[in-house]
From Swiss-Prot:
Organism expressing this protein natively: Fusobacterium nucleatum subsp. nucleatum (strain ATCC 25586 / DSM 15643 / BCRC 10681 / CIP 101130 / JCM 8532 / KCTC 2640 / LMG 13131 / VPI 4355)
Name under which the protein is recorded: Lon protease
EC id: 3.4.21.53
Active-site residues from the entry: 674, 717
A GO CC term attached to the entry: cytoplasm
Keyword Nucleotide-binding: yes
Keywords: ATP-binding, Cytoplasm, Hydrolase, Nucleotide-binding, Protease, Serine protease, Stress response
Cited Gene3D superfamilies: 1.10.8.60, 1.20.5.5270, 1.20.58.1480, 3.30.230.10, LON domain-like (2.30.130.40), P-loop containing nucleotide triphosphate hydrolases (3.40.50.300)
């Protein structure tokens, strides 16, 4: 004997392997169901003989054969009733029903079926299926999927039960079919019922046709309305489920533009006519919720206190003067002109210099919400604009998601790594960003999913990039670009002592511990353990030191630390870089120090040249771009045109020899015209056998007439030279105005020369 909760059912017979909805409203039945749900147990379901009996006594009031069923889903109705989807497993014989407190419990045995797979059973099943198919066609109330699913069923018992459950016959007749355990006999009984129902259906159709022909349009409309009303009443009125009621309340209480409200009201109207379990209902519900969650009219008030804003920016960041000035300028204009639209900035510079954290400080200084949109690796336009609702699993794009997250229509929005977007067959996300960042268009930005204009003109957009060359020209044109440069060692020292060390102490529970890292120790840490444009690795190393110190605090109860240079190896291991020493003026033939500007800051660009047997050509290696190759051709032409100034060591040099120029780190692509004078110097050195000073570096574009033209990234390149231990640099005369950007501490330790022509360069670079 088995035991399970028992639920009496009225006017409904449930067959095995059929998912059936039932409505539970009686107090004892609800208590029984709640216990089964809580204990995750199965239910025994049995039909009441008298449906009008509110409280059955179980003394002959319940049929002896029922089913054991699993609970598939529950829906709590507004009237406190519960709608339950159950799936029956087997026929059971109900033995004894008892009432324990407020719940029904029964003992039962599972009924075994007979003649399940005999030839006669197969024959009667085919006959029943053929008749049932005609019955379905005649009635016209069943979906085509019912017949398709029956064709796939190989278990005759299951198929017969499904057909019986769909017959329009009384509960008593269905109960009689349920009680037949002999599958063959059950088939005969169902066949009899189908034949009888087809005869009745045929007569009803004849009568309906006669009646409908006599009905006028008004009567017909009344008939349909009454029929729909009765159906809704029987089904529990789907339009009033909790989710729909909540959505309607939110729509009433949310301030929305007129056109948005009208569209949502139309969508809600559709939703109320749908069953809550339909796929389309879920799509519409998700859409309405997505639109309601957008900040259509929610706006934060700007804090237009320039003094306070300046204090916040200075508190969190050292340097970055231009970016801070730009924000304060904007706040001043906003104070004078409150109707001013948002700003679109782009902070470009090496990684780790504080671009992202600066944007957070901008948001705080303005009193606005901060939200971040990561664009690195985005290749699909739909990630920006969203997917149209016709697609399965569609959703809003990153911009609308960010606006939802912000909760206001004027946040500070960080568009992180805008240079890392790429395109493929799905579209170009950079083109989609044009509408987002165009002040003339973003007032009516239309996400494909939302499908209504949304005003982005109040958003303060700040994009970040490492290399603007990877950003399309139209996109660059829409942004106010601020070029942020690398930090010098002195700036890194200040940042480390004022910000990074304190932050690392706080993060590692050392805020109350006295930790001192003297400047000379910090310089050693910067020079020998980190080589970067920013301070990201420096922060990481300081955190590592703090973790080691935290361990000493726990193990030895140390309260004070004063680090020495030798302690760095103890906490961080061997130095990762050799300390740069001032390069000597001794020269090498064909080896020249150039300067380059990369996405991670300024670096030295070495050029190595030798002559080999050949026919006066220049061979270039080192993964060079077309512009750099052309610079080499220009340099060679200039040298050949000025052989009187730079006489070759061999008069037949260009007949018998070839110059090979190599740029080390061959796996790294190199391009640009700024290595022109560097290449020229290498060619002249090899040609004349003159040694080139190794304590000097240079940058500048060369022309075939020997003029030295201006280049970009002066500050970065000078910092890179200083980092490499070089004390003298040669810059184009036209870049003299750019030296104001070079930190004063570098100017005081380095000698900067300016050249109008290559003659000025040649006077400085060769060992005399």
């Amino acid at each position: 004997m088995l035991k399970a909760p028992f639920l009496p059912i009225r006017d409904l017979v449930i067959f095995p392997n059929v998912v059936t909805p039932i409505y539970v409203g009686r107090a004892n039945s609800i208590a029984t169901l709640e216990k089964a749900i809580a204990n995750k147990t199965k239910l025994v379901l049995g039909l009441q003989k008298d449906a009008s009996q509110e409280n059955p006594t179980f003394d002959g009031d319940i049929y002896e054969v029922g089913v054991i069923a699993n609970i598939v889903q529950i829906i709590r109705m507004p009237n406190n009733n519960i709608k339950v989807l159950v799936e029956a497993e087997d026929r059971v014989k109900i033995k004894n029903i008892e009432k324990e407190e407020n719940e029904y419990v029964t003992t039962y045995t599972v009924i075994k079926e007979t003649l399940k797979d005999s030839k006669e059973t197969e024959a009667i099943y085919r006959k029943v299926f053929t008749r049932f198919e005609k019955y379905v066609s005649m009635i016209g109330k069943f979906s085509s999927e019912l017949i398709l699913n029956l064709k796939k069923i190989e278990d005759y018992s299951n198929g017969l039960d499904i057909m019986a459950s769909n017959l329009n016959i009384s509960s008593e007749k269905k109960q009689e079919i349920l009680e037949i355990s002999n599958v063959r006999d059950r088939g005969y009984r169902i066949l009899d019922e189908i034949v009888a129902e087809m005869e009745i259906a045929s007569l009803e159709k004849t009568i309906d046709d006669k009646v409908k022909n006599k009905m006028n349009e008004a009567q017909r409309a009344y008939y349909l309305k009454e029929k729909i009303s009765v159906m809704k009443e029987e089904l529990g009125d789907f339009s009033q489920d909790d989710d729909v009621i909540e959505i309607v309340d939110r729509l009433k209480n949310t301030e929305l533009p007129k056109e948005v409200r009208e569209k949502l009201e139309a969508e809600v109207k559709k939703l109320t006519k749908m069953q809550p379990f339909s796929a389309e209902s879920s799509v519409i519900r998700n859409y309405i919720e997505a639109v309601l969650e957008l900040p259509w009219n929610s706006e934060t008030n700007d804090v237009l206190d320039l003094k306070k804003a300046s204090q916040i920016l200075e508190r969190d960041h050292y340097g970055l003067k231009d970016a801070k000035e730009k924000v304060l300028d904007y706040l001043a204009v906003k104070k004078l002109n409150p109707s001013m639209n948002g700003v679109i900035l782009c902070l470009s510079g090496p990684p780790g210099i504080g671009k992202t954290s600066l944007v957070k400080s901008i948001a705080e200084s303005m009193g606005r919400k901060f939200v971040r949109v990561s664009l690195g690796g985005v290749r699909d336009e739909a990630e920006i604009r969203g997917h149209r609702r016709t697609y399965v699993g569609s959703m809003p794009g990153k911009i609308m998601k960010a606006m939802k997250e912000a909760g206001t229509n004027n946040p500070v929005m960080l568009l992180d790594e805008i240079d890392k977007m790429s395109n493929d067959f799905k579209g170009d996300p950079a083109s989609a960003m044009l509408e987002v960042l165009d002040p003339e268009q973003n007032k009516n930005f239309e996400d494909h999913y939302i499908d209504m204009p949304f005003d982005l003109s109040k958003v303060f957009f700040v994009a970040t990039a490492n290399d603007l060359r990877n950003v399309s020209a139209p996109l660059r044109d829409r942004m106010d670009i601020l070029q942020l440069s690398s930090y010098t060692e002195f700036e890194k020292l200040h940042i480390a002592q004022k910000f990074l060390l304190k932050q690392a102490q706080k993060e590692n529970g050392l805020a109350n511990i006295d930790i001192k890292i003297p400047d000379k120790v910090m310089f050693k840490l910067i020079d020998e353990y980190t080589r970067e444009a920013g301070v990201r690795n420096l922060k990481r190393e300081i955190i590592t030191i703090c973790r080691k110190l935290a361990r000493e605090v726990v193990e030895k109860d140390t309260k004070k630390f004063n680090l020495k240079p030798t302690d760095l190896e103890k906490y961080l291991g061997k130095a990762k870089f050799r300390p740069e020493k001032s390069r000597k003026a001794t020269g090498k033939i064909g080896v020249v120090n150039g300067l380059a500007w990369t996405a991670v800051g300024g670096v030295t660009l070495d050029v190595q040249g030798v002559d080999t047997p050949g026919k006066g050509e220049v061979t270039l290696t080192g993964t060079l771009g077309n512009v750099m190759k052309e610079s080499a051709s220009v340099a060679m032409t200039y040298v050949k045109a000025n052989l009187k100034k730079y006489p070759p060591k061999d008069k037949d040099f260009f007949k018998d020899r070839t110059i090979h120029l190599h740029f080390p780190e061959g796996a790294t692509p190199k391009d640009g015209p700024s290595a022109g004078i560097t290449i020229t110097t290498a060619i002249v050195s090899v040609l004349t056998n003159k040694k080139v000073r190794q304590d000097i570096a240079m940058t500048g574009e060369i022309t075939i007439t020997g003029d030295v033209l201006a280049i970009g990234g002066v500050r970065e390149k000078v910092i890179g030279a200083h980092r490499a231990g070089i004390k003298e640099v040669i810059l184009p005369e036209d870049n003299r105005v750019d030296t104001d950007e070079i930190p004063d501490e570098l100017k005081s330790t380095m000698k900067i020369h300016f050249a109008k022509t290559y003659d000025d360069v040649s006077k400085l670079v060769f060992v005399k």
